[in-house]
Amino acid sequence: MISPDPRPSPGLARWAESYEAKCERRQEIRESRRCRPNVTTCRQVGKTLRIQQREQLQRARLQQFFRRRNLELEEKGKAQHPQAREQGPSRRPGQVTVLKEPLSCARRISSPREQVTGTSSEVFPAQHPPPSGICRDLSDHLSSQAGGLPPQDTPIKKPPKHHRGTQTKAEGPTIKNDASQQTNYGVAVLDKEIIQLSDYLKEALQRELVLKQKMVILQDLLSTLIQASDSSWKGQLNEDKLKGKLRSLENQLYTCTQKYSPWGMKKVLLEMEDQKNSYEQKAKESLQKVLEEKMNAEQQLQSTQRSLALAEQKCEEWRSQYEALKEDWRTLGTQHRELESQLHVLQSKLQGADSRDLQMNQALRFLENEHQQLQAKIECLQGDRDLCSLDTQDLQDQLKRSEAEKLTLVTRVQQLQGLLQNQSLQLQEQEKLLTKKDQALPVWSPKSFPNEVEPEGTGKEKDWDLRDQLQKKTLQLQAKEKECRELHSELDNLSDEYLSCLRKLQHCREELNQSQQLPPRRQCGRWLPVLMVVIAAALAVFLANKDNLMI
């Protein structure tokens, strides 16, 4: 028997190994295959195709080169070799002979496909040779790429006169000088050189685009090659495994033939047939069980399908209900948001109302304190009013007394005036009598004169005394009249103050009643000026009363 390979299978090793180990393994495989001869049929076919492709590209580039420089080649027919066309171009008047420089330039410029294939062969020298099918695919792809290029033997047409470049000579006898342009640094550059540079740049851009396209194609081919190499490796590994199994079976058969005789082999075969029959019966029984289980499973599957259909219907119903509930939830969410916004607004209003309420409560407390102070002041004013009323009563009593005294004085003055008048009348009568006596007694005796003068002197003295008393009484009367006038003025002032205080008290009581009836929010604006006016009036009355009492 063949001993099994102790090494793990390459597939498992590839899955288990790391990236660095994989890179090292691939490098070792490349190094081991580099010395091996690399000559196969598919490589030779690819090489011929690449050579053909290279020649076609070179011819197409030469044609484009001649077209861009507005040169003309002689058409000798399709049967002639293209080298003869290159060696023998037609020379006409007005044309420039074609030099061998374009050909050398075209040969120097290596085709991008050749460069890329060279790099690919350098980068992947140790890869396993792909199968023939992959080579066919590559050959077909390259042939299709080559078919897209312009044909090989297309004749170069003569360009018209108005399309000729700066390298062609004019057909007429006149010779024109080449135009030139001056750069910023003072260097003169010919127009044809600028045109040549632009043509070279366009050609380089076109080559770059072609190279990019070829790189994309090569990347696609590389991915296909990698996949094909992986599949070929897997096939070879499977083939090696099968070969190993066949060898192990052959070894087992060989050992069995050496151990057992033909009769023993028959016995073993009979035993194996019995085992086979028993295994077949067991397999049939197991198959029947499996079929029964399958039937049960199918029945369960049908029942589950029915339940699934019912569940799907219910699911659709629940889905419709869910969508309806979702819409309701959205509407409720919008309503909830609106209510929350309203609630925030109301909370802000409530906070403002609370702050206002606090302010109003503070104002109300302040007003209550002021009300209490005003009530205390009103009580004080009422006491002052009572005192004022008592003072007025005293003053009225004094006024009555003064009026009574005035009346008594008036009566006495009248009496005194009557006495004075009577005395004046008596004096007049006495004077008349004296005049009559003087007329009746012509001789005047000096002895009797002093006796007569004495009564006259006594009468005059009495008159002067009466006059003095009368003047004193009149002065007293005038003083009493002044006092009465002053008392009348004071009484009028006190009555006016009393009436003003009564009016203010009534006004304060009315405002207090209104403040008790109206809400506190409306009273705040009206209370303050009224209270200030009442306080000012009460202070004025109080100060006036103090001044009067001091007087």
UniProtKB/Swiss-Prot annotation:
CDD domains: CC1_T3JAM. InterPro entries: Cent_Immune-Sig_Mod. It is a single-pass type IV membrane protein. Keywords: Cell membrane, Coiled coil, Golgi apparatus, Lysosome, Membrane, Mitochondrion, Mitochondrion outer membrane, Transmembrane, Transmembrane helix. The lineage of its organism: Eukaryota, Metazoa, Chordata, Craniata, Vertebrata. Interacts (via its coiled-coil domain) with TRAF3 (via isoleucine zipper). Interacts with MAP2K1. Interacts with PPP2CA; this interaction targets PPP2CA to the lysosomes. Interacts with TLR4. Interacts with MAVS. Interacts with TBK1. This is TRAF3-interacting JNK-activating modulator. GO terms for biological process: cytoplasmic pattern recognition receptor signaling pathway; positive regulation of type I interferon production. One of its GO terms (cellular component) is mitochondrial outer membrane. The chain crosses the membrane at residues 527-544. It is found in: Cell membrane; Golgi apparatus membrane; Lysosome membrane; Mitochondrion outer membrane. Residues 240-436, 464-506 form a coiled coil. Changing P529S: In a colorectal cancer sample; somatic mutation. The keyword DNA-binding does not apply. Adapter protein that plays essential roles in both innate and adaptive immunity. Plays a crucial role in the regulation of thymocyte development. Mechanistically, mediates TCR-stimulated activation through recruiting MAP2K1/MEK1 to the Golgi and, thereby, facilitating the interaction of MAP2K1/MEK1 with its activator BRAF. Residues 1-526 are cytoplasmic.
